[in-house]
């Protein structure tokens, strides 16, 4: 019988999980995964930057911050037709969810109708919709919900006690407030963080504790591995031990058993073997395509080959224009013949 979903985890409990011998931790995580999901099914999503660069914030990892010299130039919000063309390509390539990211601190009210038109158009294609636009007011969240948005991404980024080492232009409470607005609007939440930014294991525990003790567990939990970009303050940071990354995936799966745990930014640099360990540990979602906002992602052909080697299949989903989920009725095609959320790190 599946264990009860908990929101009262304690730091020492999560620390004890992190500290388990690696084989024991993977065994426990895989067992929890099988209680709630088919371990051979992986959700496939595509992420598009609909407004790149020029962000006024100072997130130390982000090449889209205008204060850093990273070679990322500010661009205007894309036209709806161009976004829908990308969404059609993503669907043809096998994506079941289409995420749109904009490098804003928060959208202006005048931006919402433009984004709403993108959302409605993508939903009409039969794709799940996700957006990451920065901080939202309650009214903005409701407007996006009315347009047909399914998921909103807003990451916590790191543990509360490490946050001030990474970001100074937005408070941790600001992030929690946006998540509350998103939940109150009836949107599903996509919320995770980034590891490999110089934090300690105890602070990685702190990030997962913050996520697992939210009023509702995020529907999707993206775990990003820092992509170091020249010009950002975190460029040159020590690399995170790959096994530590797998531990992060495994503990996320155990404490948030019904959430989709997504391999997000940093996957381009991961070996097939490391990704396979992550799938065993409970990861069941990836971003598919060659770019995540402004950073690389594995080439589609590499993903196809890895899925074939591991016997994995894309998760089946079909969403109609009214937002009804008909999971299991249509299988996405990511065969090699198929045509080919915001900051640098994935939604």
From Swiss-Prot:
SMART domains assigned: BATS, Elp3
Cofactor note: Binds 1 [4Fe-4S] cluster. The cluster is coordinated with 3 cysteines and an exchangeable S-adenosyl-L-methionine.
Annotated EC: 2.8.1.6
InterPro entries in UniProt: Aldolase_TIM, BATS_dom, Biotin_synth/BioAB, Biotin_synthase, Elp3/MiaA/NifB-like_rSAM, rSAM
Single biological process term from Gene Ontology: biotin biosynthetic process
Binding-site residues for [4Fe-4S] cluster, renumbered to this chain: 55, 59, 62
GO molecular function: 2 iron, 2 sulfur cluster binding; 4 iron, 4 sulfur cluster binding; biotin synthase activity; iron ion binding
Pathway(s) of this molecule: Cofactor biosynthesis; biotin biosynthesis; biotin from 7,8-diaminononanoate: step 2/2
Stretches assigned to the Radical SAM core domain: 40-258
Catalytic activity: (4R,5S)-dethiobiotin + (sulfur carrier)-SH + 2 reduced [2Fe-2S]-[ferredoxin] + 2 S-adenosyl-L-methionine = (sulfur carrier)-H + biotin + 2 5'-deoxyadenosine + 2 L-methionine + 2 oxidized [2Fe-2S]-[ferredoxin]
SUPFAM superfamilies, sorted: Radical SAM enzymes
Keywords tagged on the record: 2Fe-2S, 4Fe-4S, Biotin biosynthesis, Iron, Iron-sulfur, Metal-binding, S-adenosyl-L-methionine, Transferase
Pfam families per UniProt: BATS, Radical_SAM
Cofactor(s) needed for function: [4Fe-4S] cluster; [2Fe-2S] cluster
Record-listed [2Fe-2S] cluster binding positions: 99, 130, 190, 262
Known partners and oligomeric status: Homodimer.
Protein role: Catalyzes the conversion of dethiobiotin (DTB) to biotin by the insertion of a sulfur atom into dethiobiotin via a radical-based mechanism.
Family to which the UniProt record says this protein belongs: Belongs to the radical SAM superfamily. Biotin synthase family.
UniProt-recorded name of the protein: Biotin synthase
Organism ancestry: Bacteria, Pseudomonadati, Pseudomonadota, Gammaproteobacteria, Lysobacterales
């Amino acid at each position: 019988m599946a264990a009860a979903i908990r929101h009262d985890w304690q730091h020492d409990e999560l620390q004890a999980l992190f500290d388990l011998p690696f084989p024991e931790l993977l065994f426990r995580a895989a067992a929890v995964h099988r209680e709630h999901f088919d371990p051979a099914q992986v959700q496939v999503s595509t992420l598009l930057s609909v407004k790149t660069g020029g962000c006024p914030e100072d997130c130390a990892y982000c090449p889209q911050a205008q204060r850093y010299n990273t070679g990322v130039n500010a661009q205007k919000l894309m036209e709806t037709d161009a976004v829908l063309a990308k969404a059609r390509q993503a669907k043809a390539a096998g994506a079941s969810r289409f995420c749109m990211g904009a490098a804003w601190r928060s959208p202006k009210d005048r931006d919402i109708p433009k984004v709403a038109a993108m959302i409605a158009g993508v939903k009409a294609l039969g794709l799940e919709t996700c957006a990451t636009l920065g901080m939202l007011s309650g009214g903005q969240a409701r407007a996006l919900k009315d347009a047909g948005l399914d998921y909103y991404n807003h990451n916590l980024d790191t543990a509360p006690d490490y946050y001030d080492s990474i970001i100074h232009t937005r408070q941790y409470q600001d992030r929690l407030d946006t998540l509350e607005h998103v939940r109150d609007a009836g949107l599903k939440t996509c919320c995770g963080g980034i590891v490999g930014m110089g934090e300690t294991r105890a602070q990685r525990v702190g990030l997962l504790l913050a996520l697992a003790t939210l009023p509702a567990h995020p529907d999707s939990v993206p775990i990003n591995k820092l992509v170091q970009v020249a010009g950002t303050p975190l460029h040159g940071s020590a690399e995170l031990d790959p096994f530590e990354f797998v531990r992060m995936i495994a503990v996320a799966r155990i404490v948030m058993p019904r959430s989709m745990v997504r391999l997000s930014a940093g996957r381009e640099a991961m070996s097939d073997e490391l990704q396979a360990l992550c799938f065993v540990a409970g990861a069941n979602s990836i971003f598919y395509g060659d770019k995540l906002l402004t950073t690389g992602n594995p080439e589609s052909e590499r993903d196809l080959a890895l899925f074939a080697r591991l016997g994995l299949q894309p998760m089946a989903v079909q969403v109609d224009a009214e937002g009804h989920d008909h999971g299991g009725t249509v299988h996405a095609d990511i065969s090699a013949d198929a045509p080919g959320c915001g900051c640098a790190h994935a939604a």
